[in-house]
């Protein structure tokens, strides 16, 4: 493979050639990768160009068609965040085919900031802060009457990249805590981890394969699979000694009516969780935070190697690790109440 990397116009000309050879966008992408390496456009970009070719538009130049309405741009960016709100500015810029500075400006205009590795509103409005505060007050009041942390089962999703380069420090304002952000290879393979756990450890997890997503139907089946794992690993629930208290976020696939019906059938109690609150979700502030550091500079060559690494990583964590993640909740609820619902640092 030579060191030559085609520019945008050259790459698009190659795609026209592939299009007329009746190649698919995916096949064309594989040919580009084989010839020029991983710096070529993503499959999604190739698919977008193929759609243009099918409509008869074979112009490979970036033309100004008039600036689209700002709300359209924001909707496009928001759609990417809805798909994966842990993406970096660079990843977002590459998908939108704009500069990283443009994404940074738009995120700022949309009022977004990264908290616990996820993009959330920079400035919560009064109603959002009040909801967070009220929710935490209710949970604290209940906890002080009688602890229920041992009954919490929580879970979430996280992208795992086959190649995760060295973590880079982020730049923050004076007085603000420094953070480190993994900058994975946008063009590399990745798999989505869906994991559920409690104070004693991991109960069940799945790795989604290429093209799979968490929609309502899949999430329903995941809950059924989780329930089966609970019956095997936590017999106290099968004996009805305890009722599951389920903590998950407000993603659309989690709040669909069909999912609510499934949770009701399972007789699980759903713990209140305010929107825009990754700082109050144990998977985000504890499990994934620790996992992210361990994943830095990891390289996987297959789906099976990712699974093997996860099995070993989960098993290497002692009971204290999982216990601590769940039992941090009251302290975080208190801090949220004390700050009138603002984000925790």
From Swiss-Prot:
Changing residue 119 to P: what effect?
Alters cleavage sites in second strand cleavage
Q: How is the cofactor bound?
A: Binds 2 divalent metal cations per subunit. Magnesium or manganese.
- The main enzyme category here is hydrolase
Organism, scientific name: Drosophila mauritiana
Q: Name one GO biological process term.
A: double-strand break repair via nonhomologous end joining
Site entry (Critical for target DNA recognition), positions: 186
Q: Which gene encodes it?
A: mariner\T
Q: What is the effect of changing residue 216 to A?
A: Reduces rate of second strand cleavage
Stretches for region Catalytic: 126-345
Essential cofactor(s): Mg(2+); Mn(2+)
Outcome of residue 284 to A?
Loss of catalytic activity
Please give the name of this protein: Mariner Mos1 transposase
Residues marked Important for base-specific DNA-binding (site): 48, 100, 118, 293
Compartment(s)? Nucleus
EC no. given is 3.1.-.-
The UniProt entry, under PANTHER family, shows: HISTONE-LYSINE N-METHYLTRANSFERASE SETMAR, MARINER MOS1 TRANSPOSASE-LIKE PROTEIN
Q: How does it assemble?
A: Homodimer. The complex has a trans arrangement, with each transposon end recognized by the DNA binding region of one transposase monomer and by the active site of the other monomer.
Determine if Disulfide bond is one of this entry's keywords: no
The site feature described as Important for target DNA recognition and for strand transfer activity is recorded at: 186
Q: Where is this region: Linker?
A: 113-125
What biological function has been recorded for the protein in this entry? Mediates transposition of transposon Mos1 by a 'cut and paste' mechanism. Transposases are sequence-specific nucleases and strand transferases that catalyze transposition through an ordered series of events: sequence-specific binding of transposase to the terminal inverted repeats (IR) present at each end of the transposon, pairing of the transposon IRs in a paired-end complex (PEC), cleavage of one or both DNA strands at each transposon end, capture of target DNA, and strand transfer to insert the transposon at a new site.
> Where is the segment annotated DNA-binding?
1-112
Q: Does the keyword Cytoplasm apply?
A: no
Per the database entry, where does the chain bind DNA?
24-55, 89-110
């Amino acid at each position: 493979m030579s060191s030559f990397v085609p520019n945008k116009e050259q790459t698009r000309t190659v795609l026209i050639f592939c299009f007329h050879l009746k190649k698919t966008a995916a096949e064309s992408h594989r040919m580009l990768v084989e010839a020029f390496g991983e710096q070529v456009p993503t499959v999604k970009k190739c698919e977008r160009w193929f759609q243009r070719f099918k409509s008869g538009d074979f112009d490979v130049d970036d033309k100004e068609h008039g600036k689209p309405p700002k709300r359209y741009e924001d909707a496009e960016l928001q759609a990417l965040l809805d798909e994966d709100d842990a993406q970096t500015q660079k990843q977002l810029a590459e998908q939108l085919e704009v500069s990283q500075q443009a994404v940074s400006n738009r995120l700022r205009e949309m009022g977004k900031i990264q908290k616990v590795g996820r993009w959330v509103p920079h400035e919560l409005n009064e109603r959002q802060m009040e909801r967070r505060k009220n929710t935490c007050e209710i949970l604290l009041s209940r906890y002080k009457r009688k602890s229920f942390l041992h009954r919490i089962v929580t879970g979430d999703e996280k992208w795992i990249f086959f190649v995760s380069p060295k973590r880079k420090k982020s730049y923050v304002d004076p007085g603000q805590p420094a953070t480190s952000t993994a900058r994975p290879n946008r063009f590399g393979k990745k798999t989505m981890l869906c994991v559920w756990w409690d104070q004693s450890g991991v109960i069940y997890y799945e790795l989604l394969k290429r093209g799979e997503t968490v929609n309502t139907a899949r999430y329903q089946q995941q809950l059924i699979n989780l329930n089966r794992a609970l019956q095997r690993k936590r017999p106290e629930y099968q004996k009805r000694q305890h009722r599951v208290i389920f903590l998950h976020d407000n993603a659309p696939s989690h709040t669909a009516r069909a999912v609510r019906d499934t949770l009701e059938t399972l007789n699980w109690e759903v713990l209140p969780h305010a929107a825009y609150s990754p700082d109050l979700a144990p998977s985000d502030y504890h499990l994934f935070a620790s996992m992210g550091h361990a994943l830095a500079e990891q390289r996987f060559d297959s789906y099976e190697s990712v699974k093997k690494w996860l099995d070993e990583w989960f098993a290497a964590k002692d009971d204290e690790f999982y216990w601590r993640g769940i039992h941090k909740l009251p302290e975080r609820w208190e801090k949220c109440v004390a700050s009138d619902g603002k984000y925790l640092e």
